[in-house]
Amino acid sequence: MKIEAWPMYGPLNSTDVFAKFIKSMQATGDHVCIDRETDGDVAVIWSVLWQGRMRKYKQIWERYRQANKPVIVIEVGGIRRNKSFKIAINGVNRKADFANQDVDNTRWPLFNHVFKPWKQTGDNILILGQHDASEQWNGMPGMNIWFEQQINEIRKHTDRPIQVRPHPRNPISLDLKKYKNVSLTRPIMDSNTIDDTNFK
């Protein structure tokens, strides 16, 4: 298989993981072309967030997807940032194929993480934002508009306090003065936490 891998546009935290991923592909005998355009069978990129260093990944993504060829996407994990990683085909999260049909339950204990029960009650309704420069948000309104839509929909059903929390790397400017009992909590970067961000 001919693989086009692009570590050069990855964020700074991708270097080690990308290098190990390339090494694993080469070990299987695949022909891996690094940081150059070829007529590959598959491309490998880091994330589908078209921002900063990763902005150029969008061209690679579009070239392969328009040719109906797969794109392997590597991304930081959703559990412990920079200690767990996602690897999927044609996206991340719900749009992705993680090829995990045959994964057993022996991997979960390695995270040393305990699930807490889902809370059905509480004082606040929390609305969490996505990064609107991400392929995951493709076709959706800007984050400010989306937050307002969610607030208006929630207000049709309850007057409970609403807390709006944007994506840590996607600042917003939302005028909450026109809403009653709605607050904005900006994430604070904290490298001592599981996801480099506070959750308070």
Label each residue range with its predicted role.
Residues 69-140:
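A nucleotide-sugar donor-handling region in carbohydrate enzymes
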Residues 11-18, 52-56, 81, 135-136, ...:
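Short, charged/polar "capping" segments at the starts of alpha-helices
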Residues 1-51, 133-134:
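N-terminal pre-catalytic "stem/leader" segment of glycosyltransferase-like enzymes
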